[in-house]
Amino acid sequence: MKAQLCILLIALVLFQTFSQSDAILSAIWSGIKSLFGRRGLNDLDDLDELFDGEISQADVDFLNELMR
């Protein structure tokens, strides 16, 4: 029973880490961008198009409403 509880807690921590990794990486990336300035990294802003484009603005608004 103790082993199952430990495995469950470790899995929860790993899932939480995975779900928050995007926020951490975006914060690090914005810090790097501010260090080098906007002019040096203007062309790298095109990487935003790599994300899934099927999420509409209405979906984003709905998710923002849920997070309030």
Curated annotation (Swiss-Prot):
GO cellular component: extracellular region; membrane; other organism cell membrane
Similarity remark: Belongs to the non-disulfide-bridged peptide (NDBP) superfamily. Short antimicrobial peptide (group 4) family.
Modification type Phenylalanine amide: residues: F36
Keyword Transit peptide assigned: no
Entry keywords, A to Z: Amidation, Antibiotic, Antimicrobial, Fungicide, Membrane, Secreted, Signal, Target cell membrane, Target membrane
Keyword Signal (UniProt): yes
Other known facts: Negative results: does not show antifungal activity against Candida glabrata (ATCC90030) and Candida parapsilosis (ATCC22019) (MIC>400 uM).
GO biological process entries: defense response to bacterium; defense response to fungus; killing of cells of another organism
Propeptide span(s): 38-68
Compartments (UniProt record): Secreted; Target cell membrane
Signal peptide interval: 1-23
Expression (tissue specificity): Expressed by the venom gland.
Record's protein name: Amphipathic peptide OcyC1
